[in-house]
């Protein structure tokens, strides 16, 4: 099964992708995780991506595609769940071309929908462990036992630069103008299923 997961920032794509990948026993390829790993390792691609992410802008196609290609094993996996890619029609077309060279097609595009105010609340309240970015808390929904301290490893919790309310609103604006059009692109292929992503 080959699935693309789309939705605004804060809709729960990462959480749902992890659950789906485990249930379906397919690899989960997260562009956001690739970006953060490259930023943490201070690679040239990571530094470039960070400058765009901190401003709330989409990372340019050539940078995104370069990072995503590093995540694909050789040969291309026959089944996968993509989270965070494609983010615009140009990337969707590039993905279709790549899959076509491997004699594959997407099976489904899952569109997670969430109200904008809920998205802002979710993201602005998120806190991440400096020691392990997989340890994520929320000041309202899943607060740590001790403020600012990771329950799992005792590491410091912090708010990512791209999680401030101002940056979140900018990211939503970018999502509406650049990413939402891929939903129509995939609807024309009969691939889209819309899922309400409400609640914490």
UniProtKB/Swiss-Prot annotation:
GO molecular function: adenylate kinase activity; ATP binding
Enzyme class, spelled out: transferase
Catalysed reactions, as listed in the record: AMP + ATP = 2 ADP
Protein residues bound to ATP: 10-15, 126, 136-137
Presence of the UniProt keyword Lipid biosynthesis in the record: no
NMP: annotated span: 30-59
Superkingdom of source: Bacteria
Keywords: ATP-binding, Cytoplasm, Kinase, Nucleotide biosynthesis, Nucleotide-binding, Transferase
InterPro entries listed in its UniProt record: Adenyl_kin_sub, Adenylat/UMP-CMP_kin, Adenylat_kinase_CS, Adenylate_kinase_lid-dom, P-loop_NTPase
GO CC list: cytoplasm
Pathway the protein contributes to: Purine metabolism; AMP biosynthesis via salvage pathway; AMP from ADP: step 1/1
EC number assigned by the record: 2.7.4.3
A Pfam family recorded for this sequence: ADK
Domain topic, free-text comment: Consists of three domains, a large central CORE domain and two small peripheral domains, NMPbind and LID, which undergo movements during catalysis. The LID domain closes over the site of phosphoryl transfer upon ATP binding. Assembling and dissambling the active center during each catalytic cycle provides an effective means to prevent ATP hydrolysis.
Family assignment from sequence similarity: Belongs to the adenylate kinase family.
HAMAP family: Adenylate_kinase_Adk
Subunit structure: Monomer.
Protein name, per record: Adenylate kinase
Organism: Streptomyces lividans
